[in-house]
Amino acid sequence: MRVPIITTLLTLALTGLSQAASLGVETTHGVECNRKTTKGDTVKMHYRGTLAEDGSQFDASYDRGTPFKFKLGAGRVIKGWDEGLLDMCVGEKRTLTIPPEYGYGDRGIGPIPGGATLIFQTELLEIEGVPKDEL
């Protein structure tokens, strides 16, 4: 009888871990397109980042008036961005809810405390090198 109980507890613990690490992706403004973002694309985004705990803003490209440019899926941004911005159309907007495992983990960075869940409002402005008529 002990083996099934231990197995059940282990299964519940592992299920809890996988749920804790789930990335939330909500499309807030959908767009139809022929060409969506893929791993390796260089993209330009606008974003606003806030802490889930209290809603305080820690960064926003909108405030600077300058989009953020990076290569998607190359590990140059947090894992939540590399995964949460795939299959996106130019003009689409998404809200990403990024748990610590997909963000900055226990270490934090700057105004972001360790263990923080992050909320990013994102907008895809451009997939570099893709002509507008192919979008």
From Swiss-Prot:
Tagged with keyword Ribonucleoprotein: no
Keyword set includes Ligase: no
Group of enzyme by EC: isomerase
Record PROSITE patterns: ER_TARGET (PS00014), FKBP_PPIASE (PS50059)
GO biological process, one term: cellular response to farnesol
Motif (Prevents secretion from ER): 132-135
Catalytic activity: [protein]-peptidylproline (omega=180) = [protein]-peptidylproline (omega=0)
Compartment(s) where it occurs, according to its Swiss-Prot or TrEMBL record: Endoplasmic reticulum
Keyword vocabulary terms for this entry: Endoplasmic reticulum, Isomerase, Rotamase, Signal
EC number in record: 5.2.1.8
SUPFAM superfamilies in UniProt: FKBP-like
A cellular component annotation (GO) from this entry: endoplasmic reticulum
Single GO molecular function: peptidyl-prolyl cis-trans isomerase activity
Activity control summary: Inhibited by both FK506 and rapamycin.
Ranges where the PPIase FKBP-type domain occurs: 40-128
Signal sequence interval, chain numbering: 1-20
Chain's role: PPIases accelerate the folding of proteins. It catalyzes the cis-trans isomerization of proline imidic peptide bonds in oligopeptides.
Family: Belongs to the FKBP-type PPIase family. FKBP2 subfamily.
Protein's UniProt name: FK506-binding protein 2
Gene transcribed to yield this protein: fkbB
